[in-house]
Amino acid sequence: MSLPGFGAPAGAATLTGLMQARPLTIGSVIDHAAQHHGRREIVARRHDGRFERADWATVRDRAGRIASSLARLGISQGDRIATLAWNRMPHLELYFGVTSAGHVLHTVNPRLHADHLVYILNDGGARLLCVDPDLLPLVEPIIDRLTSVERIIVLCARSEMPESGLPNLVSFDELIEGAEPMAEWPKVDENAASTLCYTSGTTGDPKGVLYSHRSTVLHCLSACTADSMALSARDCIALVTPLFHVNAWGVPFAAAMCGAKLALPGSALDPASLFALMAGEKATFGLGVPTVWMSFVDHVER
């Protein structure tokens, strides 16, 4: 055969490489984690303070059930699913279930002023809002101002549902109850939006930033290289950086890619709780903003 530059006629078609010709999608990342690192543990503090344990295979299974449940509700590719939640197990499962099915995960910072919460949720156009039970009081006073939210998913079991005057509340367990895990993810364009984050609005209104599947997978690869974070299957990552803050620096996705263990602190971010978690789980890597580690060091040195 003739190759371009080696006797190929002028105007000959450009050759296309077919090695690993597949899109870079988040679904492929969690599938890889389940297949190659399925038994690698994830530990997370629940809303009631107790810890729960799972592994990457379980996260893939529950992510598949989330995807099937969203399809059952008529959620279409590109629709936004918002979260108002801490670093807990259901939030991690939503990270993969929502995005792998082609929806957009819109993480919202619960520390923002109510007016900013309203603006961000309305501007993002989320159809569903997934809320930790201890954060429901943030939603109750603003629910009448939300223009696109059709249903609120409370991230707990049916038996743990808190009392609330909010309409259309469904527990997380009810959402995925009876749903079969989606065996194969739907076809998703690697350049399609996967997650949506907003700036804090220090100048003017908050501004949305969309991440793509492709950019997320490339960030995963970068985070696992030696001259970046050098994350690997040998690590236990204490993920203090909030899941609602810049996709927790992309680390949940990178941990799935390399098969690292994750330790999620929930809402217990005081130095004593973080030290107990990191020491108990033998964390090798911690991610958090400087103020977190300054108080952490003070606690350790006392």
Language model regions located:
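Conserved pre-ATP/AMP-binding loop-to-beta segment of ANL
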Residues: 23, 38-40, 169-170, 177-198, ...
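Conserved structural elements of the adenylate-forming
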Residues: 60-65, 177, 209-232, 240, ...
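Conserved AMP-binding/adenylate-forming core of the ANL superfamily
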Residues: 42-88, 92-96, 113-118, 171-174
